[in-house]
């Protein structure tokens, strides 16, 4: 029973301390870069950027937009 309790506490702590960026902010940053959050892979003509807020999603930015 103690093991189950410790596992539950550990699981909650890991989820709450998942990073320094609040949920949803990564999606906003992607949209500000004129990108789209896509699951796993980007379409042709797009390059991969940072991760989005949702698990497994990547920010895909058009390759025609030049780096600033």
Curated annotation (Swiss-Prot):
InterPro entries per record: Defensin_beta-like, Sperm_Ag_11A_B
Disulfide bonds: 30-59, 37-52, 42-60
Organism: Rattus norvegicus (Rat)
Family statement drawn from the similarity comment of this UniProt entry: Belongs to the beta-defensin family.
Tissue: Only expressed in epididymis (middle part of the caput).
Keyword Secreted: yes
Localization per Swiss-Prot or TrEMBL: Secreted
UniProt key word Signal: yes
Superkingdom assignment: Eukaryota
Gene Ontology cellular-component terms listed: cell surface; extracellular space
Biological function: Has antimicrobial activity against E.coli. Plays a role in the defense response in the male reproductive tract, contributing to sperm maturation, storage and protection.
Principal location: secreted
Keywords for this protein: Antibiotic, Antimicrobial, Defensin, Disulfide bond, Secreted, Signal
Signal peptide: 1-19
GO biological process, one term: negative regulation of interleukin-1 beta production
Name this protein carries in UniProt: Sperm-associated antigen 11A
């Amino acid at each position: 029973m103690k093991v189950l309790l410790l596992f539950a506490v550990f699981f909650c702590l890991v989820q709450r301390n998942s990073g320094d960026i609040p949920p949803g902010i990564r999606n906003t940053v992607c949209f500000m870069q004129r990108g789209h959050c896509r699951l796993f892979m980007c379409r042709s003509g797009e390059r991969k950027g940072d991760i989005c807020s949702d698990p497994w999603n990547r920010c895909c930015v058009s390759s025609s937009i030049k780096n600033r």
